[in-house]
Curated annotation (Swiss-Prot):
Protein name as it appears in the record: Succinate-semialdehyde dehydrogenase [NADP(+)] 1
Keywords: NADP, Oxidoreductase, Tricarboxylic acid cycle
Keyword Oxidoreductase: yes
Keyword Transferase in annotation: no
Origin species: Mycobacterium ulcerans (strain Agy99)
GO BP terms, alphabetized: tricarboxylic acid cycle
Transmembrane segments: none
Family assignment from sequence similarity: Belongs to the aldehyde dehydrogenase family.
InterPro entries reported for this sequence: Ald_DH/histidinol_DH, Ald_DH_C, Ald_DH_CS_CYS, Ald_DH_N, Aldehyde_DH_dom, ALDH_GabD1-like, GABD/Sad-like
Record field: catalytic activity: succinate semialdehyde + NADP(+) + H2O = succinate + NADPH + 2 H(+)
Positions annotated to bind NADP(+): 134-135, 158-161, 210-211, 233, 363
Length: 458
């Protein structure tokens, strides 16, 4: 994929960039490594917090321009782009306010270990490579940058090739906020350059959010080099609705959960599992609301669903839906790419999917919802867990016993009861199974790239 800004609403390439040379990449790594030696020793949490708050101030002040840039590069609606920008600022503020406490020394009972002092200390690892996706250009990269910088690490960002201007903006705003030169750099490079960067002995660790194949590649390289990694990969999140649920609220949340970010979110609800007693009512209401969504120009504030980010994404989704229909699945609404310029695919609802169909196990990264009927809670959980992924999940029920079953038995990194899966700075984010390992956000996220050092003083 070329490093370029291409407008998904028109297919027009707006701006292209030249990839960094090997020498330029080496210089960036050297700059980061040299900066780390000083940054970790000679900056305090208070100083870093001042710069992080200044970063948030700038992001908020420039929200309209940055939102427009993200919409231009990857097609998210202008309303969701603006919300993402403000959320990114919130992430910087959260770590500015909480990093010192999250990474404070943890005392142990010194007497029990025969010491005068005994405690755990969290120390930064060094240069961390972040390989980030296009679907949340600022929030995803920012939620790496904020905890990494506050912990005393320095960052190298290899962003997706279709959001280069968003990537450059983040490095620029961090520098303008006062973080020292070399603390956070964007590398405009292709995916093929990642291996060389990660194998460089000056790079201590890596984090990747992206596809399963990309995660396998980075995980294998990091494993070979014995370097810690965090992988946040795909998801095929279940959304279960039981008879006691507030059906209208569940349906409206299901619609939002499926088409958020034009359906291109790892934690978007993708597989909808309705109890047999309310299945027909759920499907009718769901199809009605999905069909009524406004699809169009993402810069129009009235648009609810914009284009997919790439032509390849649109074509892959169309093929997945066509294959399911050919195998006997029923298309309740949508189901065909929209005519005209841009990479649009309409909100689509599919039922009558059987276990032998590819759609039963595949992740669909767009506004396509699969709906399943469950005879009881046991079957609902069985369907929910019938995936190689385990990122997020939703369950709707007022029955407390059912809530406990879902919390305990759904195989996922996150379970949201009577609500939509959302990432919050205050809560750890990540998955199990083939959705990856490690955690972002909250205290767990900032500690991922710290040396957990045991200190014993006799």
């Amino acid at each position: 994929m070329p490093i370029a800004t291409t407008n998904p609403a028109t297919g027009e390439t707006v701006k292209t960039f030249t990839a960094a040379s090997n020498d330029e990449v080496d210089a960036a790594i050297a700059r980061a490594y040299a900066r780390f030696q000083d940054y970790r020793r000679n900056t305090t949490f208070a100083q870093r917090a001042e710069w992080a708050h200044a970063t948030a101030d700038l992001i908020e002040a420039e929200a309209d321009q940055t939102a427009a840039l993200m919409t231009l590069e990857m097609g998210k609606t202008i309303a969701s782009a603006k919300a993402e920008v403000l959320k990114s600022a919130k992430g910087f503020r959260y770590y500015a306010d909480n990093a010192a406490a999250l990474l404070a020394d943890e005392p142990a009972d010194a007497g029990k270990v025969g010491a005068s002092q005994a405690y755990t200390r969290y120390q930064p690892l060094g240069v961390v490579l972040a390989v980030m996706p296009w679907n949340f250009p600022l929030w995803q990269a920012g939620r790496f940058a904020a905890p990494a910088l506050m912990a005393g690490n320095v960052g190298l960002l290899k962003h997706a090739s279709n959001v280069p201007q968003s990537a450059l903006y983040l490095a620029d705003v961090i520098a303008r906020a006062g973080f020292p030169d070399g603390c956070f750099q964007t590398l405009l490079v292709s995916a093929s350059a990642v291996e060389g960067i990660l194998r460089d002995p000056r790079v201590a660790a890596a984090t990747l959010t992206g596809s399963e194949p990309a995660g396998q590649s980075v995980g294998a390289i990091a494993g070979d080099e014995i370097k810690p990694t965090v992988l946040e990969l795909g998801g095929s999140d279940p959304f279960i609705v039981m008879p006691s649920a507030d059906l209208d609220k569940a349906v409206s949340t299901a619609v939002t959960g499926r088409v958020q970010n034009n359906g291109q979110s790892c934690i978007a609800a993708k597989r909808f599992i309705a109890h047999a007693d309310i299945y027909d009512a759920f499907v009718d209401k769901f199809v009605e609301q999905m069909s009524a969504l406004t699809v169009g120009d993402p810069t129009d504030p009235q648009t609810q669903v914009g284009p997919l980010a790439t032509e390849q994404s649109r074509d892959e989704i169309a093929q997945q839906v066509d294959d399911a229909a050919a195998a006997g699945a029923v298309i309740r609404c949508g189901g065909k790419p929209l005519a005209g310029p841009g990479w649009y695919y309409p909100p689509t609802v599919i039922t009558d999917i059987t276990k032998d169909m590819n759609l039963y196990t595949e992740e669909v990264f767009g506004p396509v919802a699969s709906v399943y009927r469950a005879a009881d809670i046991d079957e609902a959980i069985e369907i929910a867990n019938a995936t190689t992924f385990g990122l997020g999940s939703n369950a709707w029920t007022q029955d407390e016993a059912e809530q406990r079953r879902f919390i305990n038995d759904i195989e996922a990194g996150q379970v949201f009861i009577n609500g939509m899966t959302v990432s919050y700075p205050e809560l750890p984010f990540g998955g199990i199974k083939r959705s990856g390992y490690g955690r972002e956000l909250a205290g767990h996220g900032i500690r991922e790239f710290c040396n957990i050092k045991t200190v014993w003083v006799g």
